[in-house]
Amino acid sequence: MESIIQQINQLRTSLRHHEHQYHVLDAPEIPDAEYDRMMQQLRDLEAQHPELVTNDSPTQRVGAAPLDAFEQVKHEVPMLSLDNVFDEESYLAFDKRVHDRLKTAEPLTFCCELKLDGLAVSLLYENGELVRAATRGDGTTGENITANVRTIRAIPLRLHGDNVPRRVEVRGEVFMPQAGFEQLNEEARRKGGKVFANPRNAAAGSLRQLDPRITAKRPLTFFCYGVGLLDGGELPRSHIQCLMQFKAWGLPVSERVKLCTGSDQVIAFYRQIEQDRAGLGFDIDGVVIKVDDLALQEQLGFVARAPRWATAFKFPAQEQITQVREVEFQVGRTGAITPVARLEPVQVAGVIVSNATLHNADEIERLGLRIGDTVIVRRAGDVIPQVVGVVMEQRPDDTKEITFPSQCPVCGSDIERVEGEAVARCTGGLFCAAQRKEALKHFVSRRALDVDGMGDKIIEQLVEKQYVENPADLFQLTAGKLTGLDRMGPKSAQNLIAALEKAKQTTFARFLYALGIREVGEATAANLAAHFRTLDNLRAADIETLKSVPDVGEVVAKHVMNFLSEEHNQKVIEELEKVVSWPEPQQIVVEESDSPFAGKTVVLTGSLTILSRDEAKDRLTALGAKVSGSVSKKTHLVIAGEAAGSKLAKAQELGIKVIDEAEMIRLLGE
């Protein structure tokens, strides 16, 4: 018996600690599934030994105490939580308990809703005006967050309609949509601020800011799902009709609410939502099932911490705890170096997970991760599993530091990480096996060396059969080798050899673009070719000389220098120089012109409908313009076609003049 008491006390201590981390500090250390498991274990032990149940046991209350920093609010009607079921068998047991208590065998109608993964709040309206908002807290006492909630545009400050009660307390969930969460984290990374592990943490942290001006900048929203206090008014006697009444008053209600009669319909709804979950745009962790008839709800009543007439049918956990055995580094098709954690296999969201992405060196540093750590791994929908946190209290003494490599693990080339960029990259773009297919596809593309007939499928076969390892090998191919490829007859093979022969005569600008140097597009390649005129001159240039070229800043200059100084790339370029040639670039002589484009750096963006992009470039260049591929402070003018995107946005941000295609045509004619 003593060991049982000790086990119960240990569980209570752990649960209280994690309740405080989750509800008070907004810094959960374990996944919800682990907390649920511990709570269920404690419930089972207390059920077996009811004499050991105490009033302060975590099983006897809803949550944790509120922060002292906020004014405390006592809920006139307690905000209870829900009991959970985790599989169909457990749900059917809940359904049977409801039927048994009501003494009926007839199918019951349930209102089924999404179980939102955010922060539960209470909104008190008096005479239609929002007068107070509070967190759930421990279910009896919460925190006054009125100033913060007033900043959430989805929440009306005043209800509208003729039948608004004198006092009504609406309950619901404040949450952060996925798109807003990603944007918030991206901005935080850029500014070196706090990055949130998931949207729930972001919503909780945003809602409980002491400065409402910070909350106002956060992309929070709200759905209501129930009522607490009701005084001086009436509501329908059906839960779903209550939700429709809230909607009529101007409160947001989820569209994914459905009446289901009988357990088969409820389970079908659960399965459908589970299937649709990844595309909702916000996090949910299950379906809430409530008896729809309010009279039956009153008849069923409550247990200590939850209603008997409702349950949360939870999805398989998207987060679990496991251990990092090793960290390896993978090279992507663009040369990006990604650290990958090798994990003790664990089942997450119904799938065995043994690997998880760590993204980059900054993420490892943010997590404070070491090899041997116990970690929280998350898998949501089709998203690649990722480590979202370290359980520091379980860190063993023999953990090892993770060391980022300085050479590519695939080809041994130097790894570069340009200041201001999170991703480290292999510089051996012409040589690295991991980048081989993409480098070759780019090299033969229409705007590069333009090898007619050399499509992606052919490149893939050439690499898979090990006929080609780098761009120089393309010019050693024979018709005999090519005829061994799928759907490649003798005539097609001869045509491809002829196309390769033709591609040997190109321009310096096309050649530079074909090399696939990071962030060197067509316009930048043309500017480099015009400025340096020969490959030797370009190779001899230092960072400052490179930066003197239009369209080349510090970052692009470093990419060019690192690429050309990499030993493996140098060998491939030397081989290419033996077979590929180009005339010396002609300096563009521009007659003195009164054209408004003369001497201006111009950027084209979006789709042009009157001229092709190449025609527009040629016309602009002939009038003395420098056509650039990116917008910077040096840009004088942006010409925006249809569906212009980020370049237009950046131009507007920098205050650069923008004209449309029609205005460009008019100015070209002057």
UniProtKB/Swiss-Prot annotation:
Presence of keyword NAD: yes
EC class: ligase
EC number: 6.5.1.2
GO CC annotations, alphabetized: cytosol
Chain positions recorded as NAD(+) binding sites: 32-36, 81-82, 113, 136, 173, 290, 314
Reactions mediated catalytically: NAD(+) + (deoxyribonucleotide)n-3'-hydroxyl + 5'-phospho-(deoxyribonucleotide)m = (deoxyribonucleotide)n+m + AMP + beta-nicotinamide D-nucleotide
PANTHER family recorded: CHROMOSOME TRANSMISSION FIDELITY FACTOR 18, DNA LIGASE
NCBIfam families named among the record's database cross-references: dnlj, PRK07956.1
Protein's recorded name: DNA ligase
Lineage: Bacteria, Pseudomonadati, Pseudomonadota, Gammaproteobacteria, Enterobacterales
